[in-house]
Amino acid sequence: MNLPNSLTILRIFFVPLLVVVLLTQKPNWDFWGLSVHFEVWGVLILLAAAATDAADGYFARKRSEITTLGILLDPIADKLLISAAFISLVAMGLVPAWMVVIIIGREFIVMGLRNIASAEGLVIPASPLGKTKLFLQVLAGCIVIYSARHVGIKLLALVLLWLVVISAVVSAVHYFLVFWSQVDDRFKQHQRAPLVLEQKKNPQDVPTP
């Protein structure tokens, strides 16, 4: 297995570890008088998982190791990580459930649109909005996790959560518009095709001079 795919699988392994740390709120260790509580471990795990997302794409392009397995696993790993993190935060009472429904619902809507497009031979390109959304999700996740024992940053956490929700909605609308535009173009092409064939079968008589 190549390096990019190994990093993607590592990201998947981070998911249950993050969930256990958040839901058990452990470990809470003291190192030579320095307390390192569960929220620090949660942030570190989420950042490490996000780092593998950036690294696998970089190495796949750098080493020309883009594979079908990697194309399949990478978005699945991202969705597992974000879904598990935010569902755990709902269970901890740190994030409203309706926000997470929108965040995760967006992921499945876009995935569905991509699958339909792929089945029809269409391609929905990655959007800068999608990349911004993922960055905001990781940032908001880290701040919300850290706010579990640091109430002074709860307002910042709420602001970031709203930005995540807004970016999720905007990017979902963008993907739908791109999808609809491509479907509409395909439909118009199918409508024009019989006319073109009919013209070829029955060419107009060209008058001779």
Where are these regions (language model features)?
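Alpha-helical transmembrane bundles and membrane-interface segments of multipass inner-membrane proteins
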Residues: 1-209
